[in-house]
Amino acid sequence: KGRKHVQAIPKQYMKEAVLAKDLYIGGQQINLMKSVSQASFVDLKIVSAGYGIIDGNDKTVGYDSTFKIDNKKPDCCHSKSEQTQLANALEIPSGFKKLLQDKSYDCGLILLGDDYLNACDPFTNWNPAFPTIFFGTKNSIKNLKLIPNVKCELANQTHAKKYSAGVTSLKGKLGALILEAELEKPGTIDKCLDPNISLYSVI
């Protein structure tokens, strides 16, 4: 799956293809991409319910699939088991585990909602080889904060109000602020990764 799945797209559809980083038009993606485009040190990976784990620069075409659970919508998963089946079919848990073990990275920044987080099977697959920041809800960080090399930061309505962002786009805004701070003052990310320093005091 992943890049292999992208490469398997029939040629007749490729004339409509766009880069994966430009395919998604949600607030989180828009907020984040403004800064990613300026930060050459970023290697953007996307967890896709259509392709698996892909590079931001992979060419893709649109699709109707999501990891969100809603039994009233045909493009959503109708249960947790269906969500898991889709994730496994796209080899997301194994692909994410492999990505986190890639020692060529200096650090990681994970901006996933709860449904997409679950698709990555975090509680059995996460053992990062590099320091990693994760923004999440109170529920999602409860167990992740126990994993070595993962620094969890709560992202909720209070933070959304502080940073003038919608709740669904907040993680993208926070990720963008980290990248902007690093571009303005190299070394800022090191402070963000420090377990003894609140990330919110840095950005």
Per-segment meaning from a language model:
Residues 43, 106-109, 111-115, 135-138:
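Structural motif
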Residues 46-48, 131-138:
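Short internal beta-strands
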Residues 35-36, 40, 44, 48-49:
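Extended, H/D-rich, highly charged conserved domains that either
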Residues 50-99:
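Long, charge-dense
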Residues 56-60, 118-124, 143-147:
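A short acidic (Asp/Glu
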Residues 142-203:
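C-terminal accessory extensions appended to soluble enzyme cores
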Residues 1-31:
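Active-site helix-to-loop segments that bind/position phosphate- or nucleotide-bearing substrates
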